[in-house]
Amino acid sequence: MNKLSKNMSKVSPNLDPIVLLIDLDNTIIGNIIPQINEYYLIKDINKKLKKINKKQIRYNTKLLHEELEKYIIRPKFSKFVRNINKYDNIELFIYTASENSWANYIIKQIEKVINYKFNRPIFTRNNLVINEKGKYKKSINVVKPLIIKALKKKKKYNLENIKYIALIDNLRNVLIEKDKLIKCPEFNYRHQINYLRMIPEDILKKHYIIVEDRFNLKHSNNLYDFYEKYYQVLNSDYKLTKNNPNYLNDKYWFNFSLVLKQNLSNMSFTNLIKILRQIK
């Protein structure tokens, strides 16, 4: 057992798991709306091509991986998960409000880039609850039974409950169990792309209406009119990157790792959460 694991045992002599649920958007990654738009646009077009027995567009995952690594994944997050591997009983789960199929897809791509696999299941919009005001919320009590079931399969824990659990999220009011929330600063770096970059020209000429539907544009009479409307949308989207410089030196996950290492072995989990909430 390495030094960090020995320190961990001072907090959890029975090797109780410490479960960190981590939000996806604006916590692990920045503003990924451009990539979501591209992903669903390709799906829309391929659905049409499949119906008419035409060759479908191949989504360029290599390009996505490059952009995840360089721009979209929050700085130092990959180092954070490598540091987590040094601890015997810290368990990472994803808890996002994103739609289920997209969340599972993009998380698998993130895992390939950072060379780390999160615990399963991945908690998504399907695992949200509706509060008394009719708003969707995350709830530790909802996902906890599924976490216990998953950890029991590892056969390294003997547990009926989880003593140490928290959610790291950039939103203040997202969690029902507010005492378990570690709010982090928002990471909103946006890597803007041309949404048409993967679409062959011959396919675009025949199916540009699908692009218009995706971006809620009025149908054009010809390709020229389409391009005029499309580039107005694209230019507006590029303007949304104006705040990117504010996020270039983000150190949240670096500081989180440092605080965790310095304090995990010498304070209660409740006090540790209080310290982690102070990280900027």
Residue ranges with predicted function:
Residues 16-28, 88-91, 161-169, 180:
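Core residues of folded domains in eukaryotic genome-function proteins
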Residues 25-33, 174-175:
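Short acidic, Gly/Ser-rich segments with clustered Asp/Glu that frequently serve as metal-coordination loops
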Residues 72, 77-109, 125:
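Substrate-recognition element of Asp-dependent hydrolases with the DxDx(T/V) motif
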